């Protein structure tokens, strides 16, 4: 118990003690080196680099042992609660190392058989999964959404380990993310599961992510038998029983619960449908008692979320479309990737939004391209994160069509792609 609390204490933000800096160590899949040896070598590396500025990643090493066994060493999440990159003295911090290897297997399907039918009820990943690597960093939000979610889950686990009386202080281990489509709610849930599996790798050997297929669960055929819901959650219970695993249950588009319940009240669905809804809520109530489970849910239609479910959620976080500042960060990350891959060539330095603010948005040879990117970001407001991540590809496909392009040429293409996106939206709206 004390060991578990110690792990969590290391992961939680400190108030009076020295700040904690998290370092993720991606061990190569082919490596069989002991974590203790990797830990020792990485700490030697960090001792040689006492001062860092914000997040930083090493992918090349002087030491042969690290080269053979480690893909990358990353100081991460320093900017979740601090607006600007600031110098960090590692010698004055508590450095928490999180060593992990990625699971390359991909998702498997959880099938439920009933007579002649075979329904895919859920997708199942063993975490940390290669599929989700880098997903956390790709998600950009204006408010401290990511840090709040991390702190929430850490607190739920701490309260469980400390045996806090849940009759006096209640928490349900249920997170609800709601907002318009395309804002990254489902991706954030998957990224959060991955991040927590890595951060708590000293406590749990691996993570399990079960994504329940809401459309199958509440289809007409499926609603005829609540037994299948119980059978599905029994499979989840088997995973939870393994105390070496941290289990995440993801229910996407949870408003399906409401749709089924309201249809029953209106008399348009069989009474079995309401039994299935109640069975799901009952099963959630049962599995949330376990300290190694977190229930993650999303909804595209905020006003249609079932009240019975909303009451169960500890955190109800709205995820809206990105602001111009967030869009700038998204575009900047896309441009950096294209320069790294030499599709945009030659490489040119772009200023961050904070750096533009510091020079008062004055145009000169250094700031000119970044100011153009800022203008494109402003006129992109209203587009979802999903669309924004596609636009660099569309810009190249529609307006570049060459192996390499200068950054000036690409920004011009990106601007045209944004204009085209809004034109297409107007045309679609005219037909509706």
Curated annotation (Swiss-Prot):
Changing residue 173 to Q: In OZEMA9; uncertain significance. InterPro entries: AAA+_ATPase, ATPase_AAA_core, ATPase_AAA_CS, ClpA/B, P-loop_NTPase, Pch2-like. It holds the Pfam family AAA. SUPFAM superfamilies: P-loop containing nucleoside triphosphate hydrolases. Changing residue 26 to R: In OZEMA9; decreased protein level in patient cells. The keyword Cell wall biogenesis/degradation does not apply. Keywords: Acetylation, ATP-binding, Differentiation, Disease variant, Meiosis, Nucleotide-binding, Oogenesis, Spermatogenesis. The modification N-acetylmethionine is found at residue 1. Belongs to the AAA ATPase family. PCH2 subfamily. Specifically interacts with the ligand binding domain of the thyroid receptor (TR). This interaction does not require the presence of thyroid hormone for its interaction. Interacts with HPV16 E1. Interacts with proteasome subunit PSMA8; to participate in meiosis progression during spermatogenesis. Plays a key role in chromosome recombination and chromosome structure development during meiosis. Required at early steps in meiotic recombination that leads to non-crossovers pathways. Also needed for efficient completion of homologous synapsis by influencing crossover distribution along the chromosomes affecting both crossovers and non-crossovers pathways. Also required for development of higher-order chromosome structures and is needed for synaptonemal-complex formation. In males, required for efficient synapsis of the sex chromosomes and for sex body formation. This is Pachytene checkpoint protein 2 homolog. It comes from Homo sapiens. The gene is TRIP13.
